[in-house]
């Protein structure tokens, strides 16, 4: 795209067309006190080499996840990604985050989305999955809005074990759409406690498994309670690898399953871009947000792929749309699909088993440290410790010893009495030496 600067005559003509005579008049709605009346205090320009040196120095102040034993999770997980994944997604046919506006021309892209949908539906044990959402939190929010549409009710009950950032997104959108989101305290996540909050105004109950503390949940009793009251059960996950080992939410009676797919095929990426997964039952298909890619045959009987449903506001009338999502996380869901395809069903199961075994081994080491308590009865690759003292200080001491050792619960739930809780994750990247070093360092601090 060419850069076409404006001259003074161009500016005058544009200002006259909109009925003002100066730039100052154009911005008259901005109070004088809020305007910058001087030039920006910027340093002199730098050469490309100087700029690279400056930015490299700034980046060197970070501690990369790959440079130290890494046990941080809490919604974003570090896993090994085969080099072939990054290589393949950089092919020119794929290297875009956007779905084409003439999608049927791009059969390769549509087939990749179709395969992604098939994989997500299989992983979650649901009937149908969409072409992806922005991330797990927005997928959760969209699931709540979908439940409101399906049930014609306006109240969502959010488990205390739901990741607090996900709950924040749901509460924000609920406030803007005149809906009600009841967030329970972080210690309220038992099925009977959640069921007690369901009433005739409840459209859905949102529960996470593994939850934000790492606990695995049996959703079956809650699914029965939701069905009895005419509400939907929304199951959330932040660690997609867990689906290779634990019972999928669909098999436990969930009506909508949403979550974060980052841990398959995608790096930590400083918190994004990520890929939201969204799956549901066939009977709710037309209330599902985003796009749905389908398989068909053309006039000559050849297999082909099309966008079967696109009930978003860019395609249909805004008041009829199920969502205002603008695009799907195309490149991220492609990476997800490629990684999962390379693993296969047996490979994913083995990866999940290694994750679980590593976490069990680490928890066993911690259980032998005086003053440290593992709080979880069942977990996948993440669990919560009670430590003797503020967890934030212990995490800082661990970092000084070269170990990135978890997330203080107080960082996720500020204001709650959780200062002595620390959430720890362990995946296939953690060696026996890493786990031994972590346990030794924690023993020295605790």
Curated annotation (Swiss-Prot):
A single BP term in Gene Ontology: nucleoside metabolic process
**Matches recorded under Pfam families:** GDC-P (PF02347)
Q: From which organism does this entry originate?
A: Methylocella silvestris (strain DSM 15510 / CIP 108128 / LMG 27833 / NCIMB 13906 / BL2)
Q: Which InterPro entries match?
A: GcvPA, GDC-P_N, GDC_P, PyrdxlP-dep_Trfase, PyrdxlP-dep_Trfase_major, PyrdxlP-dep_Trfase_small
Q: Could you state a single Gene Ontology molecular function term?
A: glycine dehydrogenase (decarboxylating) activity
Sorted UniProt keywords: Oxidoreductase
The record's family statement is: Belongs to the GcvP family. N-terminal subunit subfamily.
Which reaction is the catalytic activity of this chain? N(6)-[(R)-lipoyl]-L-lysyl-[glycine-cleavage complex H protein] + glycine + H(+) = N(6)-[(R)-S(8)-aminomethyldihydrolipoyl]-L-lysyl-[glycine-cleavage complex H protein] + CO2
The EC number(s) given in the record are: 1.4.4.2
SUPFAM superfamilies attached here?
Answer: PLP-dependent transferases
Q: What class of enzyme is it?
A: oxidoreductase
Q: Can you tell which superkingdom this protein's organism belongs to?
A: Bacteria
Its function, per the record, reads: The glycine cleavage system catalyzes the degradation of glycine. The P protein binds the alpha-amino group of glycine through its pyridoxal phosphate cofactor; CO(2) is released and the remaining methylamine moiety is then transferred to the lipoamide cofactor of the H protein.
Q: Quaternary structure per UniProt?
A: The glycine cleavage system is composed of four proteins: P, T, L and H. In this organism, the P 'protein' is a heterodimer of two subunits.
* Protein's UniProt name: Probable glycine dehydrogenase (decarboxylating) subunit 1
Q: Give the coiled coil ranges.
A: none
């Amino acid at each position: 795209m060419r850069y076409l600067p404006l001259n003074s005559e161009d500016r005058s003509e544009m200002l006259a067309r909109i009925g003002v005579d100066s730039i100052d008049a154009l911005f008259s709605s901005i109070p004088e006190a809020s305007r910058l009346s001087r030039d920006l205090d910027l340093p002199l320009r730098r050469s490309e080499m100087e700029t690279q040196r400056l930015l490299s120095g700034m980046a060197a102040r970070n501690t990369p996840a790959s440079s130290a034993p890494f046990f941080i999770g809490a919604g974003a997980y570090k896993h090994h990604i085969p080099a072939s994944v990054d290589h393949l997604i950089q092919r020119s046919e794929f290297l875009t985050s956007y779905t084409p506006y003439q999608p049927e021309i791009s059969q390769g892209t549509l087939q990749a989305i179709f395969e992604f949908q098939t994989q997500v539906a299989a992983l979650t044990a649901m009937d149908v999955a969409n072409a992806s959402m922005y991330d797990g939190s927005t997928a959760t929010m969209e699931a709540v809005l979908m439940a409101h549409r399906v049930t014609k009710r306006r109240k969502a009950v959010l488990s205390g074990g739901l990741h607090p950032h996900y709950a924040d997104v749901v509460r924000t959108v609920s406030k803007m759409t005149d809906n009600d989101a009841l967030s329970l305290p972080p210690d309220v996540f038992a099925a009977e406690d959640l069921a007690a909050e369901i009433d005739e105004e409840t459209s859905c109950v949102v529960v996470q498994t593994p939850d934000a503390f790492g606990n695995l949940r049996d959703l079956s009793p809650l699914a029965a309670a939701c069905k009895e009251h005419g509400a939907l059960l929304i199951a959330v996950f932040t660690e997609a690898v867990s689906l290779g080992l634990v019972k999928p939410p669909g098999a436990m009676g969930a009506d909508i399953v949403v979550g974060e797919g980052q841990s398959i095929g995608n790096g930590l990426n400083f918190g994004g871009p990520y890929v939201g997964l969204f799956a549901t039952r066939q009977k709710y298909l037309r209330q599902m947000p985003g796009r749905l890619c389908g398989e068909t045959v053309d006039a000559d009987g050849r297999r082909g792929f099309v966008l079967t449903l696109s009930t978003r506001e860019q395609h249909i009338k805004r008041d009829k749309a199920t969502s205002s999502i603008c695009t799907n996380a195309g490149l991220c869901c492609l990476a997800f699909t490629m990684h999962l395809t390379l693993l296969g069903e047996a490979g994913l199961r083995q990866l999940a088993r290694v994750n679980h075994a590593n976490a069990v081994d680490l928890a066993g080491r911690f259980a032998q440290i005086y003053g440290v308590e593992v709080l979880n009865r069942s977990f996948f690759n993440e669990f919560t410790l009670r430590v003797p003292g503020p967890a934030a200080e212990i995490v800082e001491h661990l970092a000084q010893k070269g170990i990135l050792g978890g997330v203080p619960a107080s960082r996720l739930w500020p204001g709650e009495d959780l200062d002595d809780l620390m959430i720890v994750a362990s995946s296939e990247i953690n060696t026996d030496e890493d786990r031994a070093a972590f346990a030794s360092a924690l023993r020295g601090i605790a």
